Amino acid sequence: MMINTQEDKLVSAHDAEEFLRFFNCHDSALQQEATTLLTREAHLLDIQAYRTWLEHCVGSEVQYQVISRELRAASERRYKLNEAMNVYNENFQQLKVRVEHQLDSQNWSNSPKLRFTRFITNVQAAMDVNDEDLLHVRSNVVLHRARRGNQVDVFYAA
């Protein structure tokens, strides 16, 4: 299967390449294993077991990136702007500092305590064709964060 990005004008070359990686390398057992790991990780984060998460789910060589993509109308694309920027770009040590900050009793943002619920969906997994130690995983995440009373924030990620 090929995706023609000229005909399907809304499909970026990156998205087409990512789709084909997972389409051509489907492995149900690998996908189930990735789903289980992501679900366990989400549960640890939901119950705010941050040190356990860091110890059991995060490797010392991690590069944790959260990227925000700018969605613009076609008429605005004539201007050359960065379409993506890092919200987070952290290594293991920076994540460890972030965890300790969250657990600090002086951290005013945790009073009253926040409640989280993560939904992990559309998990896909594929081994890298050039590096047998590299696993590509893609998923969608919906995060609900409940604060005081009825204040709820919802975040979406893919």
Swiss-Prot record:
Signal peptide, first to last residue: none
Keywords in alphabetical order: Aromatic hydrocarbons catabolism, Dioxygenase, Oxidoreductase, Plasmid
One GO term of the biological process aspect: 3-phenylpropionate catabolic process
Pfam families, per the entry: Ring_hydroxyl_B (PF00866)
UniProt-listed InterPro entries: NTF2-like_dom_sf (IPR032710), Rng_hydr_dOase-bsu (IPR000391)
UniProt GO molecular function: dioxygenase activity
Pathway: Aromatic compound metabolism; naphthalene degradation
UniProt family annotation: Belongs to the bacterial ring-hydroxylating dioxygenase beta subunit family.
UniProt function note: Component of the naphthalene dioxygenase (NDO) multicomponent enzyme system which catalyzes the incorporation of both atoms of molecular oxygen into naphthalene to form cis-(1R,2S)-dihydroxy-1,2-dihydronaphthalene. The beta subunit seems to have a structural role in the holoenzyme.
Assembly, per entry: The naphthalene dioxygenase (NDO) multicomponent enzyme system is composed of an electron transfer component and a dioxygenase component (iron sulfur protein (ISP)). The electron transfer component is composed of a ferredoxin reductase (NdoR) and a ferredoxin (NdoA), and the dioxygenase component is formed of a heterohexamer (trimer of heterodimers) of three large alpha subunits (NdoB) and three small beta subunits (NdoC).
Name of the protein in its database record: Naphthalene 1,2-dioxygenase system, small oxygenase component
Organism the protein comes from: Pseudomonas fluorescens
